[in-house]
């Protein structure tokens, strides 16, 4: 399972509820993008969430 290397966001799980409140399992996936960033001074291709990219927590190479 892919995981954001900056914020640690990954797929989360919970219940989908019908109108009658029956529960079935579902998952929420973060919007992960594979981008090149500097890791320890070297460019590396890693998974980063779109939220981290938009907020400026990471800059592309």
From Swiss-Prot:
SUPFAM superfamilies xref list: L28p-like
One Pfam family for this entry, by name? Answer: Ribosomal_L28
One Gene Ontology cellular component = ribosome
Tell me, what is one Gene Ontology molecular-function annotation carried by this entry? structural constituent of ribosome
Q: Which Gene3D superfamilies match?
A: Ribosomal protein L28/L24 (2.30.170.40)
GO process annotations (BP): translation
Q: Where is this region: Disordered?
A: 1-26
Key words of the record: Ribonucleoprotein, Ribosomal protein
Family to which the UniProt record says this protein belongs: Belongs to the bacterial ribosomal protein bL28 family.
Name under which the protein is recorded = Large ribosomal subunit protein bL28
Organism this protein belongs to: Latilactobacillus sakei subsp. sakei (strain 23K)
Taxonomic placement: Bacteria, Bacillati, Bacillota, Bacilli, Lactobacillales
Q: Which gene encodes it?
A: rpmB
């Amino acid at each position: 399972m892919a995981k954001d290397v900056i914020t640690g966001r990954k797929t989360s799980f919970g219940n989908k509820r019908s109108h009658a409140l029956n529960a079935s399992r579902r998952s929420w996936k973060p919007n992960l993008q594979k981008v090149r960033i500097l890791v320890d001074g070297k460019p590396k291709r890693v998974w980063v969430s779109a939220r981290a990219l938009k907020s400026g927590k990471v800059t592309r190479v």
